[in-house]
Amino acid sequence: MQQIQLPQGMKDTILQECEKKKYLQNTLEQIFESFGYEEIITPTIEYYETYENAFKNIQTTDMYKFFDENGRILTLRTDMTVPIARVCASKFKDSKPPFRYRYTSNVFKVRQKFAGKRSEVTDCGIELIGLHSKSDVQVLCCALEVMKNFKNYTLEIGNVQFFQAACKVVRLSTEEINTLADLIDKKSMVDLKIYLDSLYLSEKIVDFFMHLPFLCGDVNILDKAYAYCFDESLKEVLDSMKECIQSLNELGCLENVTIDLGKVAHLDYYTGIIFEGYVSGVGTSILSGGRYDCLLKKFGRDLPACGFSVKLDPLIDHVDVQLKKKFILYYPESKQIEAMKQANTLRKEGSVILEPSLNETIYVKEVE
């Protein structure tokens, strides 16, 4: 039986699922192209050291690794941002930014048994490289244009600088920052209070971290957040976010946008705004992205960047697509040529299957 089973975390995409996925992919690619993004295709296999260079705390257990003929470690790509950073720093090292790239590629991550997650997914996304945070609104507008294709969507925006600035003022160690981030991300409030007390911080600083997981909601939450700022650097982050939100409002793009200042994931990667898109009925975020101003530097080009990716596979059942009509054209063998002529005409409306029949006449049946 093993030879007809799939490895853990893998899934076949078949028949109408393929049609829906291709429709969704084409829709997103048209949006990205309309925003001026050009396509890049990179190899499925990268050197492991490419990812090791990009991420300080790389999770090697999440990667499919193997060796080439010279003993160097290879890996199936786990995302597309790192390969694009590599391409930008090599193929476009003498070109002038900004760069606008788009992609549709399968990415791979080893999933734990019974986790219910797929090990191979299709990511469709963009990267805007070479422009600073003022351009975040451009990327957010593109993300919202994608989200409009789905019913009951939400785009949730945060900024890791709000948390990072607080930690910098308090002069926390990397270990302390990571522990705090984990507790805030999990909203483990009892454990968070115990840990904060162990750091002997002032009441105002403890109050900030204790309220951070709950500074989420509509855009007005930004005004409420000022009350917990214990340093000017925190207010500057909020000022920047309010400016971005105001720009979205002026562009008519503020519908279904919410704020979550407690987003503190991937601190070794993101450097500013972060955002996630959710669709009703899908149990996880289907769009994620943010600003990552330090990644390109690791590949030899010190350029700011912002981007996002969309996971296509969870959306297959949540896209409204008019599937092409399908017909079966039955014919007696003596009238095969005539049947083929009719089929050529009928294919303007959809796909046609020619099926021999014992009947004396040609007739057509539409497949439901």
Task: Give short role names for the model-derived ranges.
Residues 4, 51-55, 168, 320, ...:
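Short secondary-structure transition/capping segments
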Residues 42-61, 158-168, 263-272:
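Beta-rich nucleic-acid/ligand-interaction surfaces
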Residues 62-68, 171-194, 201, 279:
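Acidic, His- and aromatic-enriched active-site or binding-groove loops in soluble protein domains
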